[in-house]
A protein has these predicted regions:
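TRNA-recognition modules of translation machinery and tRNA-sensing kinases, especially anticodon-binding
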Residues: 1-134
Length: 134
């Protein structure tokens, strides 16, 4: 019995390969994420609709502390931008040289009604390039 890779898996692999050829590193990050990385570090206001229960899967009874020692909740990530923040932090901590060029593919989750064009879990790929002449 043989199997085949899912078309989405093939598409993400090909996109990652193309951007790798252009000098981008493919990065991965947690699907269960603190609201700090998912919202706060990206300047998403506390009252933004994306934070509502009807848009985001919040994890009940799971709390942690952010880097400022403030209590934060946890969510299933709503985008792959959390990987951008984590990678930029790593670059600063490790005093790495810029430019920073990353490809961030991954599953994301939205608490919404499913139909022919909407699903609670889907894939997203985003790129980030940071440099002096970017």
């Amino acid at each position: 019995m043989t199997g085949h890779a899912h078309p989405m898996t093939l598409a993400i692999a090909r996109i990652s390969e193309i951007f790798s050829d252009l000098g981008f590193d493919t990065v991965d990050g947690p699907e269960l994420e603190s609201e700090w990385y998912n919202f706060d570090a990206l300047n998403v206001p506390k009252d933004h609709p994306a934070r509502d229960m009807q848009d985001t899967f919040w994890i009940k009874d799971r709390k942690g502390l952010n880097k400022f020692n403030e209590e934060v909740g946890y969510v299933l990530r709503t985008h792959t931008s959390n990987m951008q923040i984590r990678t930029m932090e790593k670059y600063v901590q490790e005093k790495r040289e810029f430019p920073l060029a990353i490809c961030c593919p991954g599953k994301v989750f939205r608490n919404e009604a499913t139909d022919a064009t909407h699903e609670a879990q889907f894939h997203q790929v985003e790129m980030l390039y940071v440099g002096k002449d970017a």
